[in-house]
Curated annotation (Swiss-Prot):
Signal peptide: none annotated. Pathway: Carbohydrate metabolism; tricarboxylic acid cycle; isocitrate from oxaloacetate: step 1/2. It catalyses: oxaloacetate + acetyl-CoA + H2O = citrate + CoA + H(+). GO terms for biological process: carbohydrate metabolic process; citrate metabolic process; tricarboxylic acid cycle. Belongs to the citrate synthase family. One of its GO terms (molecular function) is citrate (Si)-synthase activity. The gene is cs. The active site is at 292, 339, 394. This is Citrate synthase, mitochondrial.
Length: 460
């Protein structure tokens, strides 16, 4: 009897709420030995096997498609799109737990999935959600710093700086300084990662309120609300449909394998044993670039300018095509189309389109986005300068956020960053679990390449 009472008390105090199912950390403890053994066997028995090569064009072309990174959390197929631990987006929408009465997956569920490779139960997601709520809350120096930022400072710069300012909270740094064993690095990295994921919605919401509303956050974290709903309330939004959109948005933007700039940067910085805060802040600086996360705000700006150019009215496909050709012939691109890896329509675009068809089918901006989807692939194919003429995730997200009243385009990448933290930090935890070493590829000069390609060695 006393053992049962002690167990119940432990569950309550640890955020388990009397659930008999394993917590996230307990499940990882169960999974880790088998995974470590699998990797050890692969390195021992097949360590000399070649899994990829690098051409001169790839060396000068951003190392595109060079197989040189190991990422456990997701994989990207050129034809099929992203799979999160083997699950497609439609499968995640079907299998991951949802909010009561909701239809979209909870981001807490994909956090569990990315970390464990398993679909969590509703109880496990609820427990994780409450745990994140308990971890939320910002130190005074961070809130003061955000409120002191100048209005013209880009929200992504504010986000990266705020994450750095939280670094004094790092449990990994303390454990490392206390001499923790290497095989236990992952535990404090997990703690740091959950802490920063829990705090990011408040960081982002404070940036939003301070920059655009000249206000403060009035909502206090409610343990009975999920991570996305609490985020929306802190932003100042109460629409249940917008809650659903935010759950979808924060789920589908979490991860896109390990080679993209934000994921690779987080991994690279983390490989030096930098903690979750330092690593994520660096990743967010990469996400802020126009060729990465900043693209979503650029797409919406382009679409709205096009809408204005067309007279804010519906036009024929022929008229729309002429306007798009005019831009292409002037040397401008069509933002939101094409992808470094994908060769089909991005499934992240498709699920957002399905959401819009259900919730805002008559919205003028959505109708224009749909019409662009109809005409642009054929135009880009004829233009002949892109390998993938189909829309990516950025082509749709802006019009959905705009519809629900979140119209500050410069803030959109911050939402992307809040979501992407889930994926890149899950990967960082696994980097620690598997003991990945510091990343140190070999670089060569143009002179070396010129000499090599003309040598006998290159002809072997």
């Amino acid at each position: 009897m006393f053992a049962r009472l002690a167990r119940a008390n432990y569950l309550k105090n640890s955020g388990r709420y009397f659930s008999t199912e394993p917590t996230l950390k307990e499940r990882l403890v169960q999974i880790i030995p088998g995974k470590i053994e699998q990797v050890k066997q692969l390195k021992t028995e097949h360590g000399d096997k070649i899994i990829g090569t690098c051409t001169v064009a790839q060396a000068y072309g951003g190392m595109r498609s060079v197989k040189s990174l190991v990422t456990e959390t997701s994989s990207l197929d050129p034809e099929e799109g992203i799979r999160f631990r083997g699950l497609t987006i439609p499968e995640c929408q079907e299998k991951l737990p949802k909010a009561p009465g909701g239809a979209e997956p909870l981001p807490e569920g994909i956090l569990w999935l990315l970390l464990t490779g398993e679909v969590p139960t509703e109880s496990q997601v609820k427990t994780l959600s409450k745990d994140l709520a308990k971890r939320a809350g910002l130190p005074k120096h961070v809130t003061s710093m955000i409120k002191a930022f100048p209005e013209q400072m880009h929200p992504m710069s504010q986000l990266a700086a705020a994450i750095l300012a939280l670094q004094g909270e790092s449990k990994f740094v303390k454990a490392y300084n206390d001499g923790v064993k290497k095989d236990k690095y992952w535990e404090s990295t997990l703690e740091d990662s959950l802490d920063v994921i829990a705090k990011l919605p408040e960081v982002a919401a404070l940036i939003y309120q301070n920059t655009y509303k000249k206000s403060d956050i009035t909502h206090k974290i409610d343990e009975n609300l999920d991570w996305s709903a609490n985020f929306n309330r802190m932003l100042g939004y109460t629409s249940k449909d917008f809650d659903e959109l935010m759950r979808l948005y924060l789920t589908i933007h979490t991860d896109h394998e390990g080679g993209n700039v934000s994921a690779h940067t987080t991994h690279l910085v983390g490989s030096a044993l930098s903690d979750s805060y330092l690593s994520l802040s660096a990743g967010m600086c990469g996400l802020a670039g126009p060729l990465h996360g900043l693209a979503n705000q650029e797409v919406l700006s382009w679409t709205m300018k096009l809408q204005e150019k067309l007279g804010n009215k519906e036009v024929s496909n022929e008229v729309l095509s002429e306007a798009i050709w005019e831009g292409l012939n002037a040397g401008r691109v069509v933002p939101g189309f094409g992808h470094a890896v994908l060769r089909k329509t991005d499934p992240r675009y498709t699920c957002q389109r399905e959401f819009a068809l259900k919730h805002l089918p008559q919205d003028p901006l959505f109708k224009l986005v749909s019409q662009i989807y109809e005409v642009v692939p054929d135009i880009l194919t004829k233009h002949g300068k892109t390998k993938n003429p189909y829309p990516n995730v950025d082509a749709h997200s802006g019009c959905l956020l705009q519809y629900y009243g979140l119209k500050e385009h410069n803030f959109y990448t911050v939402l992307f960053g809040v979501s992407r933290a889930i994926g890149v930090l899950s990967s960082l935890v696994w980097d620690r679990i598997l003991g990945h070493p510091i990343e140190r590829p070999k670089s060569v000069t143009t002179e070396w390449i010129s000499s090599y390609v003309n040598s006998d060695q290159s002809k072997k």
